[in-house]
């Protein structure tokens, strides 16, 4: 994958950064694509770095993700809550499945989506092979994750857990405005506020 470079002028000359490093200087972390262990490790490292730089200043997590591995997403979720720095979340494009959970996990009052973003929640999925006992163990783990994610989304959105259980039974797509009404985000953002925050 090609990563663009940006050149910055300073009193000491020019310095070239890859675009993600330059965004990191502005406390912007970009979560794009499927969430897996490698992506989670990169996002977590950036969150920890930015907290060490300034634990009181907002971190802006931009999300455009179809979701992915629940355990990798929960590692990001736990880190967002673990660090002191507030994490603002902004959905651009889509936040589906685990991406929607991370969007909703942002600091209350600082969870946003752009007008044409799509947000989708559903139950976790998985596959299993092997002996009947192994398949049963995996099925029980998926059901446990389903209950845990529904409780988390209920707490974060203000919806009753019974509604989450019903709505996540199948793919449940929402527009940005519908996600705001549901409580997954706090506002639909059409323009970036002055000051870049």
Swiss-Prot record:
Matching HAMAP family: ClpP
Main location: cytoplasm
Assembly, per entry: Fourteen ClpP subunits assemble into 2 heptameric rings which stack back to back to give a disk-like structure with a central cavity, resembling the structure of eukaryotic proteasomes.
Biological-process GO terms, alphabetical: protein quality control for misfolded or incompletely synthesized proteins
Protein name (database record): ATP-dependent Clp protease proteolytic subunit
Pfam families tied to this protein: CLP_protease
InterPro entries, sorted: ClpP, ClpP/crotonase-like_dom_sf, ClpP/TepA, ClpP_His_AS, ClpP_Ser_AS
Gene name for this UniProt entry: clpP
Entry GO MF terms: ATP-dependent peptidase activity; ATPase binding; serine-type endopeptidase activity
Function comment: Cleaves peptides in various proteins in a process that requires ATP hydrolysis. Has a chymotrypsin-like activity. Plays a major role in the degradation of misfolded proteins.
Entry's Gene Ontology cellular component terms: cytoplasm; endopeptidase Clp complex
Organism: Trichlorobacter lovleyi (strain ATCC BAA-1151 / DSM 17278 / SZ)
Catalytic reaction(s) noted: Hydrolysis of proteins to small peptides in the presence of ATP and magnesium. alpha-casein is the usual test substrate. In the absence of ATP, only oligopeptides shorter than five residues are hydrolyzed (such as succinyl-Leu-Tyr-|-NHMec, and Leu-Tyr-Leu-|-Tyr-Trp, in which cleavage of the -Tyr-|-Leu- and -Tyr-|-Trp bonds also occurs)
Matches recorded under NCBIfam families: clpP, PRK00277.1, PRK12553.1
Compartmental location: Cytoplasm
Family indicated by similarity: Belongs to the peptidase S14 family.
Keyword terms of this UniProt record: Cytoplasm, Hydrolase, Protease, Serine protease
């Amino acid at each position: 994958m090609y990563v663009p470079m940006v050149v910055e002028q300073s009193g000491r000359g020019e310095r070239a950064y890859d675009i993600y490093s330059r965004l990191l200087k502005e406390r912007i972390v970009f979560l794009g694509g499927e969430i897996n262990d490698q992506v989670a490790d990169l996002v977590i490292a950036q969150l920890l770095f930015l907290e060490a730089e300034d634990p009181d200043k907002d971190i802006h997590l931009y999300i455009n993700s179809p979701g992915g591995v629940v355990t990798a997403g929960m590692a990001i979720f736990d880190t967002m809550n673990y660090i002191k720095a507030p994490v603002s979340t902004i959905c651009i494009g889509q936040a589906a499945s685990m991406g929607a959970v991370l969007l909703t996990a942002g600091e209350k009052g600082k969870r946003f989506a752009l007008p044409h973003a799509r947000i989708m929640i559903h139950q976790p999925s998985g596959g299993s092979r092997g002996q009947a006992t192994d398949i049963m163990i995996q099925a029980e783990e998926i059901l446990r994750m389903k209950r845990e994610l529904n409780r988390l989304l209920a707490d974060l959105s203000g919806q009753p857990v019974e509604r989450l259980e019903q709505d996540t039974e199948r793919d449940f797509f929402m527009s940005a405005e519908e996600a705001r009404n549901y409580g997954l985000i706090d506002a639909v953002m059409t323009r970036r506020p002055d000051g870049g925050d």
